[in-house]
Swiss-Prot record:
Disulfide bonds: none annotated. Keywords: Viral occlusion body. Transmembrane segments: none annotated. Component of the virus occlusion bodies, which are large proteinaceous structures, that protect the virus from the outside environment for extended periods until they are ingested by insect larvae. This is Granulin. GO terms for cellular component: viral occlusion body. InterPro entries: Polyhedrin.
């Protein structure tokens, strides 16, 4: 007996025979629809918040935000680091800056020559191994909220440090929340009072970092340490119009 279309539905009331799956859905598709419905409900809840948030602009990385970066190289120095220990990079004392290994910011001129508004301050450290073909990583620990009268130890034991970032370079933001830097004439202040430049000018408005560096090597290693301060300077809009020509 061949297939007959008329036999798909029974003529008797209350009984039916479904042959095709046109009106059926898999359980997976049903669960997927439920998940999409939950996502739409969640998006509807966030829409008012997103409308307000879209009115503000923020940077994913504050270092790459608006402004001009001016670098001041404090020193370059070779130091020996014992295994399982970490050495203090600098204690920010005036006597330390007057050593022969520390030149006056490498150059005699302060790079910020005009009156500029300081927006941010970064501590940058670059580490390099002095011997070739050495397979170890650089480790680092730092503290920002130390008491000004606290005397930091020169050497500490490694305990839960973290690895220095890519290219063996690390940046630390020294800005204090709610503290604006009032001075704009940094060059004159630096030239007048170099020995007290940090204690009197910078640290009242920025964090004084205590930075320790070490290695994962099991031997004594000689490393090159380069320390810099990066000033984020506000770039003012030019006085001339941005567009010139017959249409303007």
């Amino acid at each position: 007996m061949g297939y007959n279309k008329a036999l798909r539905y029974s003529r008797h009331d209350g009984t039916s025979c479904v042959i095709d799956n046109h009106h059926l859905k898999s359980l997976g598709s049903v669960l997927n629809d439920v998940r999409h419905k939950k996502d739409r409900i969640r998006e509807a809840e966030y829409e008012p918040i997103l409308d307000i948030a879209n009115q503000y602009m923020v940077t994913e990385d504050p270092f790459r935000g608006p402004g001009k970066n001016v670098r001041i190289t404090l020193f370059k120095e070779i130091r020996r680091v014992q295994p399982d220990t970490m050495k203090l990079v600098c204690n920010w004392s005036g006597k330390e800056f007057l050593r022969e290994t520390w030149t006056r910011f490498i150059s005699e001129e302060f790079p910020i020559t005009t009156d500029q508004e300081i927006m941010d301050l970064w501590f940058e450290i670059q580490l390099r191994p002095m011997q070739p073909n050495r397979c170890y990583k650089f480790t680092m620990q730092y503290a920002l909220g130390a008491n000004p009268e606290y005397v930091a130890h020169d050497v500490i034991r490694q305990q839960d440090p973290y690895y220095v970032g890519p290219n063996n370079m690390e940046r630390i933001n020294l800005s204090k929340k709610g503290f604006a830097f009032p001075l704009t004439c940094l060059q004159s202040v630096y030239n007048d009072n170099f020995e007290r430049f940090f204690d009197d000018i910078l640290w009242p408005y920025f964090h004084r970092p205590l930075v320790y560096v070490g290695t994962t090597s099991a031997e004594i290693e000689e490393i090159m340490i380069e320390v810099s301060l990066l000033f984020k300077i506000k770039e003012f809009a030019p006085d001339v119009p941005l567009f010139t020509g017959p249409a303007y």
